[in-house]
Amino acid sequence: MLNRRQLLAAGAAGLALPGIARAQQTPGVTATELRIGCTMPFSGPASAYGVIGRSHEAFFKMVNEKGGIAGRKINFIAYDDGYSPPKTVEQVRRLVEQDRVAFLFNTLGTPTNSAIVRYVNARRVPHIFLSTGADKWGEFKEHPWTIGWQPSYRTEAQIYMKHLLEQNPNPRIGLLYQNDDFGKDYVIGVRDVLKERFDQVVRLVSHEVTDPTVDSQIVSLHNAGCDVMVTATTPKFAAQTIRRVFDIGWRPAFHFLTNVSISVGTVMEPAGPEKGVGIITSAYLKDPTDPAWDNDAGMNQWRAFMRENIPNGDLKDGSYPFAFGVVNTLMHVLQKCDGNFSRENVMKQVADIRDLEVPTLLPGIRVNTSPTNFHPIRQMQLQRWDGRTWRRFGGVIEGANV
C-alpha cells in the first residue's frame, strides 16, 4: 500500500516520463530535433511555387538560429515532386518511412495531395496546412489527419458568381479550368450559384497541366460568344490566358482569375500588365506590390525577414507573403504544443486556433479552426487589376460556401 508521499512521487514521475516517452516514440521527435517533411514543385509546370518551399527553409533556419522551438532544432526536409502525383507518392513515402518525419507541412498542389491523402491518414501522420485550396481538405470526417489553410477554391468561385449576377443577371460564361481536383472545384462553385441555369449559360473548356499552351481553348471560348471569362488555372497558364485574351481582341465584360495565380511578378508582368486591366480576383493576403502596405507593421515584419534571410527574393512575388503567413500559423501551433509534439497533440492544437492574426493576412481576416472546422481561412475580399497593382473593393466576405 503506497502512502501519500509515494503516491505524489509516482504522480510526478507519471507526468514526467510520458513526455520523455513521447519524444522517443513519435517519429521525427527527439530531445533535440523536430523533423518536418514537405513536397514542393521545385521543377516542372508549377515551379513558380517552389519559392514557397525555399521561404520555409529560410524561416526554419532563422528559428534554429534563435534557439529553435521547445529546446529543439527544426529539421525541415523538402523534396521536389515536380508537381507529379506519382513522384509525390514516392517522396512522401521517403519522408514518412525513411526520414521518419513527425508530420507533413504545406505540401503543395491539389492533384499531388490527392495522391497521398489516404496513405498519410492510414499512417496517422499529420498532413497540415496544405498549399492548395481544394474544398475537400475541410472534410474532417473523411480524413481527420489532413487540413488545408487558404480559402477553398469552391468558396472563391461562389463569391465571383454572386458578384457577377449582381452586375449581370444574364451572363454568357466561358470557364477555363485545369483538369484536376483544383480546377473542378471552381466548376462546382460556379454550379452552386447558377444551379439549374449552369448548363445554359456556361461553356466549359479544360486543359491538362502538361499542355504547352491554352491558346486553342481561349479561341474556342471567344468564338462561342462568351462575355464573361473565368480562369481557374496555375500561374504559367494564367499568364498565357491573359495575354491571349488580349491579343485576339477579346474584351469580356468580366474576367475572373483564381487567386492562386495573381502574383504580379510571375503572372501579371509576364502577361503584360496592361493586358490584364479590369481582371477581378479575390484576396486574403496583403499584396506586396500595393503601396497601401508600405508602412504596415505585418508587411514590415515580412520585409525584414526577406532582407535578412532571402536577400535575392522577388519582393513582388505574392508566394513569399503566403509562405510567411502559413509558416507563422504553424509556429503558433508548435508553441501551443508546449513541447509535446506527439502526432495526436499536433492535430489537437491544429484544430484549436481562435482568431489568430497573421502578419500577411488582410485586416479583418483571421485564422480559425475547431474539431469540426477544417477550413482555417473563410474570409476574402474582391480586388481589381488596374495595370499596376490590385485594388481591393467592397468589404470582407466571410464564410465557407458563401
Where are these regions (language model features)?
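N-terminal secretory signal peptides and thylakoid transit peptides that target proteins
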Residues: M1-G14
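Immediate post-signal peptide segment of exported/extracytoplasmic ligand-binding proteins
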Residues: A23-I36, A70-K73, L165-N170
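Extracytoplasmic "Venus flytrap"
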Residues: V29, G37-E57, Y79-P85, L108-G109, ...
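Beta-alpha junction/loop-to-helix N-cap segments that form part of ligand/metal-binding clefts
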Residues: A48-R54, K66-E139, W149, S206-V214, ...
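Extracellular/periplasmic Venus flytrap/periplasmic-binding protein
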Residues: K87-E90, D135-G138, H143-I248, A292-A297
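Periplasmic-binding protein-like
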Residues: R100-L108, I128-L130, G174-L176, C226-P235, ...
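Extracellular/periplasmic periplasmic-binding protein-like sensory domains
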Residues: V245-F324, V396-A400
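Segments of small-molecule ligand-sensing domains
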Residues: E308-P321, T329-W390
